Regions:
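Residue(s) in the substrate-gating loop at a strand-loop-helix junction
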Residues: 146
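Substrate-binding pocket helix/loop in short-chain dehydrogenase/reductase
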Residues: 102-103, 110-112, 209
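Alpha-helical segment proximal to the catalytic Tyr-Lys
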Residues: 131, 175-176, 237
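C-terminal substrate-recognition "lid" of short-chain dehydrogenase/reductases
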Residues: 123, 217-246, 251
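Active-site helix of classical SDR
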Residues: 126, 162, 170
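Short C-terminal tail/terminal secondary-structure segment
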Residues: 2-5, 151, 240-264
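Short, small/polar-rich loop/turn modules that mediate ligand/substrate recognition or access, typified
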Residues: 92, 178, 183, 239-241
Length: 264
């Protein structure tokens, strides 16, 4: 069955957005190691091509430059995936952007851009990929959300709201597509050692996160990728409509960060 094939099956195909770096690239690497053929999509064409060339088996991967917020680009990219591989078994909606500003300083243009990428993108990619999955019996979709969608904090009005909405979109997708053989789940990462985190997390924020997370550390892109891989695997064949927090216990602890409670 499509999307539930045994690890290493030569026919299986995964589409990953935001795949040029970080969690997206780690996820592409995971799928390749599991025997999938992989389509890597990203808006940053040069970085995407360089990342794809550096993969261990680039012959089983294609790189497609795509802005997931634009329907024509999404549809064109998925058509190219079908031409190259003939099918799609898994879709990982990872592409995302963030604006870290107080509510009253966030412009409407910034708000709309975050919503366009973080929410419209998964909607459009699902609409484009799901019909292809149905041709071979179904598949699996994983949306990359965030603990910022589970908890509110300052400076995340657009980002946090977009991720909370993505979690509900996940449930809507799961309910509507489940009967068709497509499972949909979300992963809500906690702090992860990515380039974006290194740029926006000050030493004080990093120290507070380590103090608030029971495992006392940031996660790695590879750990998030393995979580995504599990949700796309036969081991998760009865998991549908769930949001899995991969956060070292941060959400369970209920401890906030003083550095993110400053006055806006």
């Amino acid at each position: 069955m499509s999307g539930e094939s045994a690890t290493g099956h030569p026919a299986t195909v995964a589409v990953i957005t935001g795949a040029a770096r970080g969690i997206g690239l780690a996820t592409a690497t995971w799928f390749l190691a599991a025997g999938y053929r992989v389509a890597l999509l990203d808006i940053d064409g040069p970085a995407l091509k360089a990342a794809t060339r550096a993969l261990k088996d680039p012959s089983r991967a294609i790189a497609l430059c795509c802005d997931v917020s634009l329907q024509p680009e999404v549809e064109a990219a998925i058509r190219q995936v079908v031409v190259a591989f003939g099918r799609i078994d898994s879709l990982v909606n990872n592409a995302g952007v963030a604006i870290f500003k107080p509510l009253l300083e966030t412009t409407h243009e910034e708000w709309r851009r975050v919503m366009a990428v973080n929410l419209d993108g998964p909607f459009l990619c699902t609409q484009a990929c799901a019909p292809v999955m149905l041709r071979t019996g179904g598949g699996s979709i994983v949306n990359i959300a965030s603990i910022s969608g589970l908890r509110a904090s300052t400076l995340r009005v657009a980002y946090g709201t977009s991720k909370a909405a993505l979690m509900h979109l996940t449930r809507q997708q799961a309910v509507e597509l489940g009967n068709l053989g497509i499972r949909v789940n979300a992963v809500a990462p906690g702090p992860v050692e990515t380039e974006m985190a290194r740029q926006v997390h000050s030493p004080a924020i990093r120290a507070d996160y380590r103090d608030a997370i029971p495992l006392a550390r940031y996660g790695t892109p590879e750990e998030i990728a393995a979580t995504v891989g599990f949700l796309c695997s036969p081991a998760a064949s009865y998991v549908n409509g769930q949001v899995l927090a991969a956060d070292g216990g941060f959400d369970a602890s209920g401890v906030g960060l003083p550095t993110l409670r400053r006055k806006a």
